[in-house]
């Protein structure tokens, strides 16, 4: 990983589903937003879920294997219409775009938003870059809350 390694976080709540794991803090209750992520920033997503208001149901899907990606299985595991893909990769041609394309093909009304960037970054330390790219826990939590509050038109 650039400028670092995967950080530690409590993995005990994640349930193994083969090529991905699922964290459902509410034990399967209604999900407002599912967050798909992988790699080093999973710890930020995990922290962001803890920062979210208790009335927002959030499920996390952590990809363990990126390729081959069975996007339909990932979408099924999300279990809700609003899916936020948080990735430390590129927006165009990334995992989030593949999941969004699969959702569009399915035609089930899933709305996929990708939190990633296109382009080059300035030099900075990792926390500064994460904040700049909205990949820090506070920004991810704010994006989850904003997305949860939005309506979806089908």
Regions found by a protein language model. Name each.
Residues 1-154:
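Thiamine diphosphate
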């Amino acid at each position: 990983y650039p400028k670092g390694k995967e950080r530690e976080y409590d993995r005990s709540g994640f349930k193994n589903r083969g090529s991905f794991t699922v964290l459902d803090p509410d034990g399967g209750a209604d999900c407002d937003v599912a967050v798909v992520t992988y790699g080093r920033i999973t710890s930020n997503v995990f922290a962001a879920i803890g920062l979210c208001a208790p009335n927002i149901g959030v499920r996390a899907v952590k990809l363990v294997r990126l390729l081959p990606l069975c996007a339909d299985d990932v979408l099924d595991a999300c279990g809700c219409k609003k899916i936020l893909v948080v990735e430390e990769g590129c927006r165009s041609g990334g995992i989030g775009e593949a999941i969004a394309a699969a959702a569009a093909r399915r035609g089930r009304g899933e709305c996929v938003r990708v939190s990633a960037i296109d382009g080059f970054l300035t030099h900075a330390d990792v926390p500064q870059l994460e904040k700049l790219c909205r990949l820090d826990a506070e920004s991810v939590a704010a994006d989850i809350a904003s997305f949860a509050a939005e309506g979806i038109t089908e």
